[in-house]
Amino acid sequence: MPVFTIRTNVCRDSVPDTLLSDLTKQLAKATGKPAEYIAIHIVPDQIMSFGDSTDPCAVCSLCSIGKIGGPQNKSYTKLLCDILTKQLNIPANRVYINYYDLNAANVGWNGSTFA
C-alpha cells in the first residue's frame, strides 16, 4: 500500500501524463509490492521555496507498511530524485523525501485494515 505524495511548485501543465504510471511501475519494482496497491498523489502549483529560492522544488513523502528503512530509503531517494529530475526538471538537491513505516492496523482499505 505504498503512497507516494509529491508537493511541488511545478505547474500542472508541466507534469507529464506518463509520470503517474512511471512512478507506479518503478515503486512496485523497488518495493516489491504489487502495482495495484501503490497510490501516487501529485500536488502541483504549490507556493513553495527551498533555500530562499522559488526555483522548481518538491517536498515528498513515501508511506508504506514495511519496506522502509535506512538502506532501502537511500535506494528509493536515488530512484525518485532521478525521476523527478528527468520528468519535472527538479534538481535532486531541491527535493526532500520523508519516509513513514506504517503499522498495518493503522491503514484502512476495502472496508477493513491490512492487519
UniProtKB/Swiss-Prot annotation:
One GO term (biological process): innate immune response
Binding-site positions, substrate: K33, I65, N98
InterPro entries named in the record: Macrophage_inhib_fac, Macrophage_inhib_fac_CS, Tautomerase/MIF_sf
Localisation: Secreted; Cytoplasm
Reaction(s) this enzyme catalyzes, per UniProt: 3-phenylpyruvate = enol-phenylpyruvate; L-dopachrome = 5,6-dihydroxyindole-2-carboxylate
Enzyme class: isomerase
SUPFAM superfamilies: Tautomerase/MIF (SSF55331)
Main localisation: secreted
One CC-aspect GO term: extracellular space
Domain of life: Eukaryota
Tissue: Ubiquitous. Detected throughout embryogenesis. Detected in adult spleen, liver, kidney, heart, brain, intestine, testis and lung.
One Pfam family in the UniProt entry: MIF
Gene3D superfamilies: Macrophage Migration Inhibitory Factor
E.C. number(s) listed in UniProt: 5.3.2.1, 5.3.3.12
Record keywords, A-Z: Cytokine, Cytoplasm, Immunity, Inflammatory response, Innate immunity, Isomerase, Secreted
Catalytic site: P2 (proton acceptor)
GO function terms (MF aspect): cytokine activity; dopachrome isomerase activity; phenylpyruvate tautomerase activity
Assembly behavior: Homotrimer.
UniProt function note: Pro-inflammatory cytokine. Involved in the innate immune response to bacterial pathogens. The expression of MIF at sites of inflammation suggests a role as mediator in regulating the function of macrophages in host defense. Has phenylpyruvate tautomerase and dopachrome tautomerase activity (in vitro), but the physiological substrate is not known. It is not clear whether the tautomerase activity has any physiological relevance, and whether it is important for cytokine activity. Required for normal neural development during embryogenesis.
Protein name (Swiss-Prot/TrEMBL): Macrophage migration inhibitory factor
Source species: Xenopus laevis
Gene: mif
